[in-house]
Amino acid sequence: MAIHLYKTSTPSTRNGAVDSQVKSNPRNNLIYGQHRCGKGRNARGIITAGHRGGGHKRLYRKIDFRRNEKDIYGRIVTIEYDPNRNAYICLIHYGDGEKRYILHPRGAIIGDTIVSGTEVPIKMGNALPLTDMPLGTAIHNIEITLGKGGQLARAAGAVAKLIAKEGKSATLKLPSGEVRLISKNCSATVGQVGNVGANQKSLGRAGSKCWLGKRPVVRGVVMNPVDHPHGGGEGRAPIGRKRPATPWGYPALGRRSRKRNKYSDNLILRRRTK
């Protein structure tokens, strides 16, 4: 992905750095409307996820995370923008007439062919079980449960690595640094997700972030005591606590937030590093 800088005519363009525009012309049979209700609220109307609301209307693109068109070659016809994710998507025309969207693998261009199955070549964009991949293969869109579809390493630029295979399990190093076990029968796609420079974008102005449905972020130290534990005081006062706290009074900055006694605790060999 190329980062595009505009000429410095206004502050918003001077500070902005956006990706080169990839047009979106989705197929009607692969999209449907979605009602994004709640805006960060639960069923009682209480804010449970902050800084969310507004944003432009979106049409959801049906993405093929299962890749269950087995042993049928497909051709990349378009590379399109998807408002629901940072990664690009590409439209695939299969030999049997089926048309589907998949995540765009890094380096794939229009006209390339892909295939999914058990005995397919180790080529960028191909999907196959982990048991058929050599060690050290870079992969994305990884299944956790057989047949459920890819759930891991789907963000822009995400890539995992197959580092070991033993018994019925394969050992993967995920983008977060976590090392965990997954069944060798689960499938994954070879290569890295495209749009690697998505984290280098700078929107340049507040309005661009509002289009994405992100509301302004307010520091707790400038709030009133009724709104945040850090609030109150005369002038620029410190937080008045031994350690930072969340708006609900729980310890912040360092406390582990993962739920205890999850079924996957025994599958994680090393915690994430970031």
Curated annotation (Swiss-Prot):
Q: Which GO terms describe its cellular component?
A: chloroplast; large ribosomal subunit
* GO BP annotation list: translation
Enumerate the UniProt keywords alphabetically. Chloroplast, Plastid, Ribonucleoprotein, Ribosomal protein
Region Disordered: start-end pairs: 1-25, 223-274
**So which domain of life are we looking at?**
Eukaryota
Question: What is the annotated localization of this protein?
Answer: Plastid, Chloroplast
**What InterPro entries does the record point to?**
NA-bd_OB-fold, Rib_uL2_dom2, Ribosomal_uL2, Ribosomal_uL2_bac/org-type, Ribosomal_uL2_C, Ribosomal_uL2_CS, Ribosomal_uL2_dom3, Ribosomal_uL2_RNA-bd_dom
**What molecular function terms (GO) are annotated for this protein?**
rRNA binding; structural constituent of ribosome; transferase activity
- Similarity comment text for this entry: Belongs to the universal ribosomal protein uL2 family.
PANTHER family given in the database record: LARGE RIBOSOMAL SUBUNIT PROTEIN UL2M, RIBOSOMAL PROTEIN L2
Read off the HAMAP family from this record: Ribosomal_uL2_B (MF_01320_B)
Oligomeric and partner information: Part of the 50S ribosomal subunit.
Give the protein's recorded name.
Large ribosomal subunit protein uL2cz/uL2cy
GN (gene name): rpl2-A
